[in-house]
Amino acid sequence: MQAARFVVSGVVQGVYYRACTRQRAVALGLVGHARNQADGSVDVVAAGSAAALDALEAWLCRARRPPRSRRSRARPARFRRLKTL
């Protein structure tokens, strides 16, 4: 299992972007979360197969859903490695 984190910016809060992202991730067999951030972006963390993560990244970069969203960019973000939980 692999994991990835993305930060999606633009008009992505208050337009059902997280719900649509969740639906897409579940359909791809991924687990994780999509959370609003104070700066107006959405933080997406997902785990699953490499192919499913690639598909989610492509969807995040091209998706026009929900229709009222105006995504300006989706970029991969780095995880901070933890020695212990």
Curated annotation (Swiss-Prot):
Pfam families (alphabetical): Acylphosphatase (PF00708)
GO MF, one example: acylphosphatase activity
The protein's enzyme class: hydrolase
Record Gene3D superfamilies: 3.30.70.100
UniProt entry keywords in alphabetical sequence: Hydrolase
Active site, per annotation: R18, N36
InterPro entries recorded: Acylphosphatase, Acylphosphatase-like_dom, Acylphosphatase-like_dom_sf
EC number: 3.6.1.7
Record flagged with keyword Amino-acid biosynthesis: no
Region (Disordered): 66-85
Domain Acylphosphatase-like: residue ranges: 3-85
Domain of life per record: Bacteria
Catalytic activity: an acyl phosphate + H2O = a carboxylate + phosphate + H(+)
Family note: Belongs to the acylphosphatase family.
Name under which the protein is recorded: Acylphosphatase
Species this chain originates from: Xanthomonas axonopodis pv. citri (strain 306)
Record gene name: acyP
